[in-house]
Amino acid sequence: MSGLEIMVLTLLLLVSMATSHQDGGEKQATQRDAINVRRRSITRTEACYEYCKEQNKTCCGISNGRPICVGGCIR
């Protein structure tokens, strides 16, 4: 193999490694966001239960400091 062929192969290898590393980072960020949404969505307090009970609904969590009251929660 000539020096040029080795350089081209090395460059291709580096590009493929960099691309796969970026894809992995995006997947990690997506998983982290999904976990954060899950944690926020299950935040419930006694005040939320009481508030929703007055409306004959179920407390499904708190968003922006306000209770989320619906007929039934979807998990």
Swiss-Prot record:
The signal sequence is 1-20
Q: Which InterPro entries match?
A: Conotoxin
Main localisation, per the record?
Answer: secreted
Q: Name one Pfam family in it.
A: Conotoxin
- GO molecular function ontology, one term from the record: toxin activity
> Any chance you could tell me the propeptide residue ranges?
21-44
The entry's protein name is: Conotoxin VnMSGL-0111
Gene source species: Conus ventricosus
